[in-house]
Amino acid sequence: MAGSSIPAQLLAAIKGRKYTSIARLFANPVDFQGWTPTGHWVATDPQTAARIIEVWFSPGGSASTITWSNETSTTKFGTLEYEIAWQAQPDDQPRVLRQAYILTFKGDKIAAARVYCAGLHTEFPEVDLEKQRRQKGLGGLKPAPSSPRAIAVKAV
C-alpha cells in the first residue's frame, strides 16, 4: 500500500478484515479512545486497538460491508469515516453503523485516535430541523425586545 494515505490503509485493512495489518498502522504506545453507545473504549497498544476495531466491525456475527467511506489526510492529521451495513436476524432487517476517526500521525504511524460512533440505525434519514425546533419549543424567530426611546438632551 505504498503511496496510500494512512486513513486509506486503515480503511483497506478494515474492509479486508486484516486486523494484524491494522495493528501495524498504530504507534506503540498509542492513545486510542473510542466512544460508542456501548461505552468508552481505550487502548494504549496497537494490538488492543486492533482488537477493539475487530469487535466494532463484527456486529452480530453476520456478514457486514462498508457501504460508504471518506478519508482525508495531511502529514500530521487525518480522518476516516465509514458506514457499516448488515442484516439483523431473525427477519433480515437492515442495520447501519457510522464511525468517524480523528487521527494524529507520528511519522508513518497513528499516534492518537479518537473514534466516535453515532449508534445503531436502520438508516440515517435527513433531519427536519424546523420540526426538531418545534418539538423542543424553539419555534420561530422571536421578535427583538423593543428598546427604550432615545431622548435628545440639550447641553446647557
Question: Which positions does each model-derived feature cover?
Answer:
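A solvent-exposed, acidic/Ser-Thr-rich amphipathic alpha-helical stretch
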Residues: 19-77
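Short acidic-aromatic low-complexity motifs
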Residues: 2-29
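Hydrophobic alpha-helical core bundles mediating ligand binding, dimerization, or RNAP-core interactions
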Residues: 7, 14, 26, 49, ...
